[in-house]
Each structure stands twice: as structure tokens, then as C-alpha cells.
Amino acid sequence: MPKRKSNKRKTKRRIKNKKTLPLDLKSLGNDISKYPFVAIEWLDIEGDSGWSDTRALNKLKLPICVSKGYLVSQKKGITRIFTDFIKTKDKETFDSIGNTTIIPTSVIQSIKKLS
């Protein structure tokens, strides 16, 4: 007697994307409390100009860097953050930002919301 196929659906396990966070760019404005403060772990380039051999080169690992800041956007393969801002007088908003960083999203290992 032939085996019957099970009618159970196989559910695909969703893998949580660790490289991006959902962000509503239109609602951010200049209210600092609306910007998520994040820690981003990302892979950097490693180089050495000295003499070596291929075995040593094959053992090298990429350094993992950590950047923390206010997440501005993640679009077109680029993640943008800033760490400093100038407060607006008498309001919880900001006029200008400083210490900006842009990171290729493809090198991000993880991004975590800190607050």
C-alpha cells in the first residue's frame, strides 16, 4: 500500500533580521526621544603591511567594531547614526547633530536597541 502524503503544512521558521530595525522616518522630526539609541556590531577591514605567510593570513579574523548612537536611517544599504546633538532652548528637540557615522548595512553583524 503506498504511503499517503501528509497534508500538514510546513511552516517556515522566520529568522529575525539582526541587521535592521523597523523605523518610521517620517515621524522622527527633531524630537530626540523618537530616535532609538542603538549599539551596532560591524565587521571592519584588517590589513598588515609586514611580511607573513599564507598560513598566518588564513588564521586572521576580521575585527568586530561597536558603534553606539541615535539611529537616523537604514536604507539603500547604508545605516546612519549620530552621537551628539545641540538641544533647542526650552524644548526636548535638537537643532544640529554631530559625530555622524555611516556603516554599510552588509557588514553589520547585529544591531540592538538600547533605549
Kindly label every feature range from the protein language model:
Residues 2-115:
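Conserved RNA-binding domains used in RNP assembly and mRNA/RNA metabolism
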